[in-house]
């Protein structure tokens, strides 16, 4: 029996995935990605490496933004965010994410919070890590019902896109050249 929990392993894996970045932004409802970012910062400090800037939306202690999402988007557009986390109610094999809902619009069977800024961040942040603790056919579908943010975009130059998908059971990497 290992001397660590599954969640501790996920947090350590997140820190490994973030290695080498200067600035990571984390959403308000993302405790494990935030813990992974803080673990990376602690590792860097112990190794006397450059301090990682962490922006956790909604946090008074770990957020240098005074106007939340607006400043995050400005910082991202200027190329000053190296990593970000996205999840989704549905995720498919092309790394498309659905944050809208399932079923036929406008009478969706399930409705999720929406996609505020997800496509923008997905296009511009160089290292987007898809994170979803649940690993099930309900989440991982052949094709998402709605594309809130596309994983890959043919014929479009974009610095961002999927870097990895981490679940409670597995770590997947992405090859943007393959669909």
Model feature map: region roles:
Residues 1-69, 80:
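N-terminal active-site beta-alpha-beta segment that forms phosphate/nucleotide-binding
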Residues 61-179:
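Conserved phosphate- and dinucleotide-binding cores of soluble alpha/beta proteins
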